[in-house]
Amino acid sequence: MCIFCKIINGDIPSKKVYEDEDILAILDISQATKGHTLVLPKKHFDNLLTISDAEYLKVMKKVKDLARVIVDAFDADGVNILNNCNEVAGQSVMHFHVHILPRYNKEELKIEFTDHSKECDLDSILATIKEKMAK
């Protein structure tokens, strides 16, 4: 049983922000930024690629609602909504979850994207995606 399933079952304590029959939202123990919250379905899905559409929509609706509350509660200057899918992308707990990361003007947390455009053929990438979507 994964650590989030143990939290959902009450075997491990957590700081619950929100709970209903389908969803649990808890404070992330790392608090990468003040108010950093995790939103997860109570039903176990390993990641974004395996969660059902119905459960995904429930989680994301609650993410939106909680993001508004958290930004307002801490007077944040912005917010990142983040999901890591699989270990290579930084997923450390194999139970689908979404991070709400309030952002503040004076902080050290960086989420940056490196420009690889010179190494990529955008037309080829687009064709590959469209071909896969057509199947």
Summary of predicted features, one role per range:
Residues 1-135:
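HIT superfamily nucleotide-processing domains
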